[in-house]
């Protein structure tokens, strides 16, 4: 990426970050006004602590995913890496001192060894990803999809065999009773400090070092970066190792917070949340664009939205988390692509495909509102959505006809 090209990119990132900051304020304000329990007013410290805890956990592994995305890759294995590293950490503690695992007195030395083992496994998995991509020649999507499936299955097998060996019976999870280790995962300020330190270090790496500039260049145009003398394979190795190491750290903190290593549920679906946070924060899935501050704000925005839904819906809010994240990601990517392309007059509902899209979007909107409220509200929402989108389609057609007429008159004049 040249200096001239970098300036518009920085302006674009700054605009994205400002918009995200404003969106976060709006989401928090709407939640405070709509929440019938007025949680933000009566329990501000507890609510803030909860949002910070969730944001920090998401942010730790989202930062690594953002580096991979900026470099032009993708890492789908983050959630499984969290489960695998957490399993390795708990397994090492059990193997080193099984008696202490049951009494809750593992000891600092054993904990340090277990955490080091989990981080080392992350670096090994990141190296495996880089090897599969750069040497074997697999697409990043395929390489990380394989480990997405494989790591979680391997973690489950490890837990069952270790518990059968040291506890006398097979189990699908490893319980952690050590107070010192649980304090590490449950104390918000420790996780927050680790997240801030990680964000600062990665931010310095990406913005102020040659390696960071080369990562942006790699994501912008890999062939041009290679021809200019940049060691692209080494950069991919760095990016995927960093992503896996961040996920490993998140896995260690997660089992400390939950007091259990359960590979069946730990980190499930987190890889999509990490990608969502990075994309919402301004990272382009095409590579070469994105910032650490934007990713941090993207994490905070996602968690604020999810927390707001939980406060407003009250019961069953976790059921709706997936589609909320999906809608936010689609809107963020579409808006980013629209701004980057500069096509202000783009038509979205042309032809039969546009008409089918209108029908589908109306049905989706109506279904979601029906699930959260009742069928009357859902029917009204679907009807309003159809009316609005049909009006948009008519407006697009009129604008297109006017543009064609202007073009024809201009040609006739010349």
Task: State where each predicted segment sits.
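Small-residue faces within membrane-embedded alpha-helices
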Residues: 21, 25-28, 55-58, 62, ...
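Alpha-helical transmembrane segments within multi-pass membrane transporters and channels
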Residues: 99-148, 297-302
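Helix-loop-helix "hairpin" substructures at the membrane interface of multi-pass membrane proteins
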Residues: 110-118, 125-129, 185-260, 385-414
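Single transmembrane alpha-helix segments in multi-pass membrane proteins
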Residues: 31-32, 44-101, 124, 131-138, ...
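Membrane-interface helix caps of multi-pass small-molecule transporters
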Residues: 67, 91, 96, 123-136, ...
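Cytosolic-side transmembrane-helix boundaries in multi-pass membrane proteins
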Residues: 1-29, 33, 227-234, 305-414
């Amino acid at each position: 990426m040249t200096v001239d090209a970098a300036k518009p990119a920085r302006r674009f990132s700054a605009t994205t970050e400002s918009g995200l900051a404003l969106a976060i304020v709006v989401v928090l304000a709407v939640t405070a006004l709509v929440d019938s329990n007025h949680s933000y007013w009566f329990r501000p410290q507890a609510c803030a602590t909860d949002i910070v805890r969730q944001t920090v956990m998401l942010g730790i592994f989202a930062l690594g995913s953002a580096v991979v995305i900026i470099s032009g890759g993708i890492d789908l294995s983050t959630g499984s890496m969290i489960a695998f590293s957490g399993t390795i950490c708990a397994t090492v503690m059990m193997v080193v001192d099984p008696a202490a695992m049951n009494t809750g007195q593992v000891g600092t030395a054993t904990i340090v060894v277990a955490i080091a083992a989990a981080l080392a496994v992350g670096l090994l998995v990141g190296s495996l990803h880089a090897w599969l991509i750069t040497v074997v020649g697999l697409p990043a999507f395929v390489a990380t999809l394989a480990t997405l499936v494989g790591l979680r299955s391997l973690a489950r097998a490890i837990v069952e065999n270790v518990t059968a060996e040291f506890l006398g019976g097979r189990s699908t999870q490893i319980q952690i009773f050590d107070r010192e280790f649980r304090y590490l995962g449950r104390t918000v300020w420790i996780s927050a400090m680790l997240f801030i330190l990680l964000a600062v270090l990665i931010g310095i790496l990406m913005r102020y070092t040659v390696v960071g500039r080369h990562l942006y260049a790699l994501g912008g145009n890999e062939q041009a970066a290679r021809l200019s003398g940049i060691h692209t394979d080494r950069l991919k190795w760095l990016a995927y190792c960093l992503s896996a190491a961040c996920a490993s750290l998140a896995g260690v903190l997660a089992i400390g917070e939950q007091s259990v290593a359960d590979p069946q549920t730990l980190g499930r679906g987190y890889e999509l949340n990490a990608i969502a946070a990075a994309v919402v924060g301004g990272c382009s899935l095409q590579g070469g664009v994105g910032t650490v501050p934007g990713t941090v704000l993207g994490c905070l925005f996602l968690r604020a939205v999810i927390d707001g839904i939980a406060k407003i819906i009250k019961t069953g809010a976790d059921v709706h988390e997936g589609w909320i994240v999906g809608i936010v990601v689609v809107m963020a990517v579409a808006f980013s692509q629209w701004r980057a392309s500069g096509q202000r007059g783009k038509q979205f509902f042309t032809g039969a495909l546009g008409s089918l899209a209108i029908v589908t979007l109306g049905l989706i909107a109506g279904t979601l509102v029906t699930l959260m409220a009742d069928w009357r509200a859902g029917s009204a929402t679907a009807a309003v959505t159809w009316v609005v989108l049909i009006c948009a389609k008519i407006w697009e057609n009129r604008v297109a006809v006017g543009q064609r007429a202007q073009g024809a008159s201009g040609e006739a004049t010349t």
